[in-house]
Regions:
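AMP-binding/adenylate-forming catalytic core of the ANL superfamily
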Residues: 1-63, 72-75, 80-89, 94
């Protein structure tokens, strides 16, 4: 099992990262894989490939997100909580198209 909070913790500790969310999306070969959605700190430039490469030094291969996206903001509900269900829906077709 992969625990999103563990991977998010590693990503959030990276230089230039303001916040991240990890969601599971369907994959034809693996059933489900992780996709990281990251917000950069103001003025920082993040490269998705650099984020996944940095994670390889700290995490087991099966825990590394298969894809990483840098976005301006994460969807939130009225309480301020990240709406991971919306992220799952947004990226659900990545590996099945």
């Amino acid at each position: 099992n992969v625990y999103p909070a563990e991977i998010e913790g590693y990503i959030n500790d990276m230089s230039g990262v303001a916040e991240s969310a990890l969601v599971g999306v369907p994959h034809p070969d693996f059933g489900e894989v992780g996709v990281a959605v990251v917000i950069a700190k103001p003025g920082a430039t993040l490269q998705p490939d650099a984020i996944t490469a940095a994670l390889k030094a700290s995490l087991a291969n099966f825990k590394i997100p298969k894809r990483c996206f840098v976005v301006a903001e994460l969807p939130r509900n009225t309480m301020g909580k990240v709406q991971k269900n919306l992220l799952r829906n947004q990226y659900a077709g990545l590996f099945t198209a």
